[in-house]
């Protein structure tokens, strides 16, 4: 057998099938496109469903690929077994109605055994087939010549990944030899059994059926071939590696982790698990973030968050207690650069996202673990083995512990978690969120007469804001009527309308519909269930009848402000990509007459300097007086032009393309200015985070921007008046006041230190001696934890050799600090353990180093009793 690198194996596979007339399909993004049945691309065939189910005919019916994939159904096993992964590569060859079983089997055998290619010893290969697949059995037996004892019929040889193609399959196994198993009594020691000797290297699926969304199976238009070879497993065989992790796909990551941790891979099972978890999870996170997924509390983002936090948890067992995963991104990029250049191209961005997520978790990890430890001890004391759903939810909601992470920590302590209770708490949170949201009168809940209205209505509002028309339908309280009187609310549909209906983030128009003395003030416009523009308003005068001729007019001032904000939103979207990076994508928007709001994907806060750059770029495009061109185009042509489409948005064959010069091009159905100069001015008023990986910018344009800047100038003038200076001197005046304040604070701290030293001197008289160990455990007056730690340090210096624990009450909360001198640390005394015991005795928790530690408590009335427990603790150490 040849010695090959993973990159050589991957390329060799593609080259082989290229020689067999296959087109090489590029690896698709891990984020599925138009496939709601999948969270991630989880196989090579998952990206080719459109070909297999007959929706699209490929240019070449023979296809091969190397497809990056993610599966998360058994994360808890990753790191603990030889071959479980969350990220992996699947090599595959596919036939869309071209060749079938005979060629698939012959070529698989050729690739594996021919010396030009992999060059396996044929005697080491066995195969499995479905019990009813006699054709495959005969091909292996008679065409290839495999002895019957190495052809095993297995009931499980039927491949099904959910919605999509499926059918019987045959698997090829490599015998690694007796070193990996030689017990004839082992019931699993056979190709297809659970063992390490016979490794599956290739799965050939004879795809004949489509698994429909309703669970039924129907014959595919043509018989197809779908094969899958796991690159990691294949490489482990070729490189004679004990596990997949001992190959060149993982070892550089493990070596880098060794350098960070100071620990060695291969010294213990526990440490090896940690190294494997880190190596697997950084591959997944790097590729997922590179493809546009960001850490969050739901969907794909939750998977990334869970994996990174699981890696942090395991890294602690190899002495890594700081953010470090981001340092491994360049290692992953180098390993995969030959075929997946995207990780190397986006390495800085990926590392920044991962570092931000790690830092966020480390901020709460220590406190969360203390709470979890407290919960576990509390339940154990009660004789319980289950952590309540309420406690699991608190750790999830407050400290960012994915429930699966809590479960793993609990498992280490012989505990379980209450999943049902956790889900109940999650449901309560979702309900609270639903109740907190404003009722926006969603069209989805409207029914009755509206659903049955099929009357046609033409929208002319792109070009006209006023028109003569007729009232086609009248509704009141959801029912069709013929007449609505003055003072009553009304809904109506016009034969043609200039009023824009709320969609794409743009609000509906306001205005008037009049006929003689009768008038309706239009307050909102939405789309009815069958697509007509449904106007809502109040009859301000006269009576409105169905069929009457009316004049419909949009309020021009409001429409003009709306279009300014909408075009500015497009400019903002592109400016964000220019300044922050191409990873930025729209996550939501709101365009009103008074302001615009734009939500976008980004991993961290946008800096002041970045906001200034973004604002400047938008204004430069406004002042450049760029024409805005709007065209209807076939969607393929629009995308070829580079038009940005909203992820998940459904588009027809013909789309509306809004183009601002050569700067911005988007698919959009909204209303826009004709030239950017009409916008006048753009001003960002706020930037904030609205969820993990999602930021929000609010901005104003035109007159609104002018008023915003005037309001800020007025505030500055008021500040100058209060500071008794002019506007230009305000910063200097504030700096002078800050300097005076710092001087006063230093003087105050000096006085407090003197008082603290005085108190510290007084409590020296309260030192106890226990079998030669000096102990000082007292309640003191300290303004905060820093003050308390300073007192402990001073007392350690004065006493020379002592165990010290001090407590103070501030705003009904307890602060505790403990210190142990170096000589007593060597005798087994540990400040972190002492402070933990004292804190738990007054309803809190904490910890720290052997020489210095701190904690908090919630029951100030028990502080004296808690401090008294220090004496027993000292005796227990002795």
UniProtKB/Swiss-Prot annotation:
Signal peptide: none annotated. One of its GO terms (molecular function) is catalytic activity, acting on a protein. Pfam families: DHHA1 (PF02272), tRNA-synt_2c (PF01411), tRNA_SAD (PF07973). CDD domains: AlaRS_core (cd00673). NCBIfam families: alaS. Catalyzes the attachment of alanine to tRNA(Ala) in a two-step reaction: alanine is first activated by ATP to form Ala-AMP and then transferred to the acceptor end of tRNA(Ala). Also edits incorrectly charged Ser-tRNA(Ala) and Gly-tRNA(Ala) via its editing domain. This is Alanine--tRNA ligase.
């Amino acid at each position: 057998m040849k010695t090959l690198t993973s990159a050589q194996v991957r390329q060799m596979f593609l080259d082989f099938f290229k020689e067999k007339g296959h087109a090489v399909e590029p690896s698709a993004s891990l984020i599925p496109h138009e496939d709601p049945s999948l969270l991630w691309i989880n196989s090579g065939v998952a990206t080719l469903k459109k070909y297999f189910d007959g929706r699209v005919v490929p240019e070449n019916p023979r296809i091969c690929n190397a497809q990056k994939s993610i599966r998360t159904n058994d994360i808890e096993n990753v790191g603990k077994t030889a071959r479980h992964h969350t990220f992996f590569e699947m090599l595959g060859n596919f036939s869309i109605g071209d060749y079938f079983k005979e060629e698939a089997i012959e070529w698989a055998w050729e690739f594996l055994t021919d010396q030009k290619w992999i060059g396996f010893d044929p005697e080491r290969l066995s195969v499995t087939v479905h019990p009813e697949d006699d054709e495959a059995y005969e091909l292996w037996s008679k065409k290839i010549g495999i002895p019957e004892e190495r052809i095993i019929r297995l009931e499980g040889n039927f491949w099904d990944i959910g919605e999509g193609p499926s059918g019987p399959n045959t698997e090829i196994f490599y015998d690694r030899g007796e070193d990996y198993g030689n017990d004839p009594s082992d019931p699993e020691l056979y190709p297809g059994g659970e063992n390490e000797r016979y490794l599956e290297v290739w799965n050939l699926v004879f795809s004949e059926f489509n698994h429909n969304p309703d669970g039924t199976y129907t014959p595919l238009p043509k018989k197809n071939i779908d094969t899958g070879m796991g690159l990691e497993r294949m490489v482990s065989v070729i490189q004679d590696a004990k596990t997949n992790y001992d190959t060149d796909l993982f070892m550089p990551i493990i070596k880098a982790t060794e350098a960070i941790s100071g620990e060695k891979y291969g010294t213990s099972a526990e440490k090896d698990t940690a190294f494997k978890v880190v190596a697997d999870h950084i591959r997944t996170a790097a590729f997922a973030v590179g493809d546009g997924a960001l850490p969050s509390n739901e969907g794909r983002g939750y998977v990334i968050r869970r994996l990174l936090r699981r890696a942090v948890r395991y890294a602690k067992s190899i002495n890594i207690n700081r953010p470090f995963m981001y340092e491994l991104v360049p290692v992953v990029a180098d390993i995969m650069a030959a075929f997946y250049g995207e990780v190397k191209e986006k390495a800085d961005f990926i590392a920044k996202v991962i570092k931000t997520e790690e830092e966020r978790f480390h901020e709460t990890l220590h406190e969360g673990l203390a709470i979890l430890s407290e919960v576990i001890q509390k339940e154990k004391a009660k004789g319980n083995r289950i952590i309540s759903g309420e406690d699991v939810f608190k750790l999830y909601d407050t400290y960012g512990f994915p429930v699966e992470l809590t479960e793993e920590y609990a498992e280490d302590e012989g505990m379980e978690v209450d999943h049902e209770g956790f889900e109940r708490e999650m449901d309560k949170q979702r309900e609270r969120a639903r109740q907190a949201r404003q009722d926006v009168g969603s069209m989805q809940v409207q029914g009755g007469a509206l659903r049955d209205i099929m009357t046609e209505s033409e929208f002319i509002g792109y070009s006209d804001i006023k028109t003569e028309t007729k009232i086609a339908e009248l509704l009141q309280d959801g029912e069709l009527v013929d007449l609505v009187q003055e003072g009553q609310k009304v809904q109506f549909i016009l034969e043609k309308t200039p009023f824009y209906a709320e969609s794409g983030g743009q609000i509906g128009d306001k205005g008037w519909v009049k006929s003689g003395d009768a008038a309706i003030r239009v307050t909102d416009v939405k789309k009815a269930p069958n697509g007509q523009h449904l106007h809502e308003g109040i009859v301000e005068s006269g009576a409105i009848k169905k069929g009457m001729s009316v004049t419909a007019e949009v309020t021009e001032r409001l429409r003009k402000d709306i279009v300014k904000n909408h075009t500015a939103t497009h400019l903002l979207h592109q400016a964000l990509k220019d300044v922050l990076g191409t990873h930025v994508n729209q996550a939501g928007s709101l365009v009103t007459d008074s302001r615009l709001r734009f939500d976008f994907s980004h991993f961290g806060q946008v800096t002041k300097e970045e906001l200034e750059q973004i604002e400047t770029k938008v204004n430069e495009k406004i002042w450049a007086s760029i024409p805005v061109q709007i065209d209807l185009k076939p969607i393929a042509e629009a995308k070829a032009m580079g038009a940005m489409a909203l992820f998940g948005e459904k588009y027809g064959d013909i789309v509306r393309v809004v183009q601002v010069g050569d700067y911005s091009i988007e698919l959009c159905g909204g209303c826009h200015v004709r030239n950017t100069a009409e916008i006048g001015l753009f001003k960002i008023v706020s930037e904030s985070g609205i969820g993990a990986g999602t930021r929000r910018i609010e901005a104003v344009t035109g007159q609104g921007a002018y008023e915003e800047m005037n309001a800020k100038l007025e505030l500055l003038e008021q500040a100058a008046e209060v500071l008794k200076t002019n506007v230009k001197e305000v910063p200097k005046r504030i700096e002078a006041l800050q300097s005076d304040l710092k001087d006063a604070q230093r003087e105050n701290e000096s006085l407090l230190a003197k008082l603290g030293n005085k108190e510290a001197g007084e409590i020296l008289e309260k030192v106890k001696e226990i079998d030669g160990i000096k102990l000082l455990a007292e309640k003191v007056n300290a303004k905060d934890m820093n003050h308390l730690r300073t007192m402990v340090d001073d007392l350690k210096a004065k006493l020379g050799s002592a165990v010290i624990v001090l407590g103070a009450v501030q705003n009904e909360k307890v602060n505790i600090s403990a210190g142990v001198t170096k000589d007593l640390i060597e005798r087994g005394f540990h400040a972190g353990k002492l402070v933990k015991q004292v804190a738990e005795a007054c309803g809190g928790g904490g910890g720290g180093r052997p020489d210095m530690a701190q904690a908090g408590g919630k029951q100030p009335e028990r502080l004296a009793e808690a401090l008294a427990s220090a004496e027993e603790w000292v005796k227990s150490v002795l």
